[in-house]
């Protein structure tokens, strides 16, 4: 998806946008992506992340609040590939990913705090479709996410 740079969007729309703290690193082959937010809140358990990515993405961005944990990964190459195959625009993880080299070749936007080779537990714990608060922003299901190399911004709706 071609979109204006986040800096240009900010210049045009200013305070209509919520700008996330600059804490995310780029990992996917797609560096510029946007879409309506689907949200998941988990802690060191990626079961709901997988469940979300198994559904049709329809160009949405899966926003994962992993509590900022650096102790295990919530997304690996298999889940990133699943996201690409199911037409998700991207995944933003407030936590870690793993398999960063294969993910760098998958045509999907992937942002996260860091990498960790340790896999998560799979107990099915967490919540879908909840309002998230991390990186100094609030993200509700259906908000519009804009992301590129300069950062992540959130709007209440898609901007013209």
Language-model regions, residue ranges each:
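Mixed-charge, glycine-accented linear interaction segment located at domain edges/termini
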Residues: 140, 144-156
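Feature captures the catalytic cores and cofactor-binding loops of soluble hydro-lyases/lyases
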Residues: 1-141, 158-160
């Amino acid at each position: 998806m071609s979109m204006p740079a986040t800096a240009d969007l900010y210049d045009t729309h200013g305070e209509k946008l919520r700008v996330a703290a600059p804490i995310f690193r780029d990992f996917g082959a797609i560096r510029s992506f946007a879409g309506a937010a689907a949200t998941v809140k988990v802690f060191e358990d990626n079961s709901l992340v997988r469940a979300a990515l198994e559904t049709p993405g329809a160009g949405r961005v899966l926003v994962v609040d992993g509590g900022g944990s650096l102790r295990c990964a919530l997304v690996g190459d298999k889940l990133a590939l699943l996201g690409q195959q199911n037409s998700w625009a991207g995944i933003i993880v407030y936590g870690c990913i793993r398999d960063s080299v294969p993910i760098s070749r998958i045509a999907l936007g992937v942002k996260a705090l860091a990498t960790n080779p340790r896999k998560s537990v799979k107990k099915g714990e967490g919540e879908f479709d909840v309002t998230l608060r991390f990186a100094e922003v609030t993200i509700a299901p259906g908000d519009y996410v804009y992301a590129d190399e300069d950062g992540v911004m959130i709007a209440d709706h898609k901007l013209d």
